[in-house]
């Protein structure tokens, strides 16, 4: 149950800008090693990233059990942040999160972006269609879709909050203000912003003929 809650917390932290603003500093490094694992959010607790675990309390799980299990999950995820381990046995790769799967999660390549949200297990990603395997033909390119050129920890931790405030000042309606805050990162009023969905759709359109375009993915809009 903890891992199920973690999956939805982690997915929301990528698909909702309000939570992404807290989570982004974990992904801002263009290098991938064990030190990446300790680049943790400063503002997550303040913006309610604990909410996906609250239903477990309502179901009767003691809070101390939830905290303990969440701690075990974070310990497990520490060793995933490495390029030194290529692949593990196939059965393990199928069931569990591994360095290979988590490299994909940290990659900004269009084919990899916003994939593999699971903490310990990969079954949730396979079930909900967010799984992607690492390809030997395309090395992972780590970092953000638009990287920030600074090592200042304050700017790294708060740059997305600043960008959100700037976008809110330019909002022309409550709908725009809502989407700038709670929509996907990169959302723009014209629908052509660099969201993960648009980036993936453009990539798919470049490699598949129009007639073979997957129906489950919305084609990119033309300017």
Question: Which residues does each predicted region cover?
Answer:
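Membrane-embedded catalytic scaffold of the fatty acid hydroxylase/desaturase
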Residues: 1-142
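Cytosolic-facing loops and C-terminal tails of multi-pass membrane proteins
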Residues: 138-223
């Amino acid at each position: 149950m903890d891992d199920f809650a973690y999956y939805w917390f982690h997915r929301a932290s990528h698909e909702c800008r309000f939570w992404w603003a807290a989570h982004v500093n974990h992904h801002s490094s263009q290098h991938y090693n064990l030190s990446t694992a300790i680049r943790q959010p400063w503002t997550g607790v303040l913006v309610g990233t604990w909410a996906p675990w609250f239903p477990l309390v309502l179901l009767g799980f003691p809070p101390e059990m939830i905290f303990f299990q969440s701690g075990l999950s974070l310990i497990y995820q520490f060793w995933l942040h490495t390029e030194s381990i290529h692949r593990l046995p196939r059965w393990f790769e199928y069931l569990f999160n591994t360095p290979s799967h988590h490299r994909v999660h940290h990659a900004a390549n269009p084919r990899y972006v916003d994939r593999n949200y699971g903490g310990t297990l990969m079954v949730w990603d396979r079930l909900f269609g967010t799984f992607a395997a690492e390809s030997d033909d395309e090395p992972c390119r780590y970092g953000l879709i638009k990287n920030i050129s600074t090592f200042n920890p304050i700017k790294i931790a708060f740059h997305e909050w600043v960008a959100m405030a700037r976008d809110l000042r330019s909002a022309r309606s409550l709908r725009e203000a809502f989407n700038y805050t709670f929509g996907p990162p990169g959302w723009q009023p014209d629908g052509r912003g660099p969201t993960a969905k648009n980036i993936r759709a453009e990539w798919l359109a470049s490699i598949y003929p129009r007639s073979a375009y997957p129906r489950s993915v919305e084609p990119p809009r033309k300017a």
